[in-house]
Amino acid sequence: MYAKQYIEVVSDNSSSSEKLKSQSSAKSRLTTINPSQSNHNIIQLRGGRSQNQPLPSPNITAGSVNSTLYQPIIRASSEKWNVDASLIYAVIHVESYFNPTAQSPAYAYGLMQITEDGAAQEVAKRYRGGVSYSIQQIFDPTTNIDIGTAYLSILDTVYLRNIRDRNSRKLLVIAAYNCGLNNLMKYGFDTQSLSHLTFRVSQLTTEQLYVKLTKEFPIKETRNYVARVVEMQNRYLNR
């Protein structure tokens, strides 16, 4: 059941890419960042304050808004960073339930729960010449979605690019977005080597990796997170 659903998520991207072209005009609304590659140390998405501890959930209020409000931003960011729009929707849904003012005790802010010294710092180093984002900028929905989507792209195309199976790579991207790549490697695969991680993952089918991340991974929040994001991505496929 899982493999069939997840393969549908991946194959849908080819058809949705044509639809995204019509949203190119919305792209100008994003903060100006030009995708490129450079070498930086792995930075945890949640920052360096408590990387090995379970992460508190954000403050979700009754004021959480409907996802359609952010559709133009999500589609533009999806096209810009070549990340499935359904995945962006799913991450936002699980992270903040589309509440742009959500904030966590772990100092994560906004729709995609961005931290200053995590995803924002990584994206700033790679694409803004090290110019950091202010808290006000991080809370801005357009910038927040741009940062979060850029970070998903970095995980997918830089750190985890040697994972050949696209389905398996996406599962790792989702897990790393939640707990940080170093924690994922350390607690899930007993390594801090990307090459060793690649080898270990190559020994697993996508189904086996899904079980490992959702049933066996020692951080409960991440287990639940991966399962929930995969579930929500399937729901958002036709957005």
Task: Please name every model-derived segment.
Residues 1-11, 121, 128-150, 154-239:
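Non-catalytic cell-wall polysaccharide-engagement segments
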Residues 2-75:
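N-terminal export signals and maturation junctions of secreted/periplasmic proteins
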Residues 47-100, 142-145, 157-163:
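Export/targeting segments at the very N-terminus of extracytoplasmic proteins
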Residues 82-101, 114-115, 148-149, 173-179, ...:
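Short, functionally critical alpha-helical segments immediately adjacent to catalytic or ligand/cofactor-binding
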Residues 100-102, 122-124:
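Activation segment
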Residues 105:
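A conserved mid-domain beta-alpha-beta active-site/ligand-binding segment of alpha/beta enzyme cores
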Residues 109-113:
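Metal-dependent catalytic core segments for phosphate chemistry
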Residues 116-120:
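Short glycine-enriched loops at secondary-structure junctions
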